[in-house]
Amino acid sequence: MHKLLVPVDGSDNAMRALEYAIRLAKACGPTEPVILYVHEPPIVYGELAIYLPEEKLKELQRKHGEDILRPYIETAKRAGVTFTSQVLIGDIPKSIVSCAETLGCSGIVMGTRGMSAIGNLVAGSVATKVIHLTKFPVTLVK
């Protein structure tokens, strides 16, 4: 079965990317979308690092990721496709590429711009970095 990695971030473009991946999965036979949310760890300075243990911080990040994934999971369920989902914590572009490599994905389908896109004309900074870091085909959905 082919796997298509679909990184999401809560944006409309990410939802359109998932919808496109679902259409591909239905049209091309056994293809499984893998819905991925990557939570970039915050930079914590001073006393906050003392009061918020690392495990508690990771738990909060995973919970936030699950909340972000919920509408995407519901969309995939309604479409009736086989899919998986996961939350990773780390550098967003590097985590996307690493996940695609680990899972042996056939490609990456992602939105052109996400929630934090500012100023890039064609593609957001995450999409641009993923394109430069990966060996996999990347489809950008606007």
Residue ranges and their predicted role:
Residues 2-52:
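Small/aliphatic-rich secondary-structure junction motif
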Residues 34, 84, 139:
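Conserved beta-strand positions in the Rossmann-like core of class I SAM-dependent methyltransferases
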Residues 53-67:
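A short acidic, glycine-rich active-site loop
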Residues 74-108:
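Structural beta-alpha unit
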Residues 110-132:
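Glycine-rich, Arg-bearing micro-motifs that act as flexible, cationic patches
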Residues 133-142:
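Short, flexible loop segments at boundaries between secondary-structure elements
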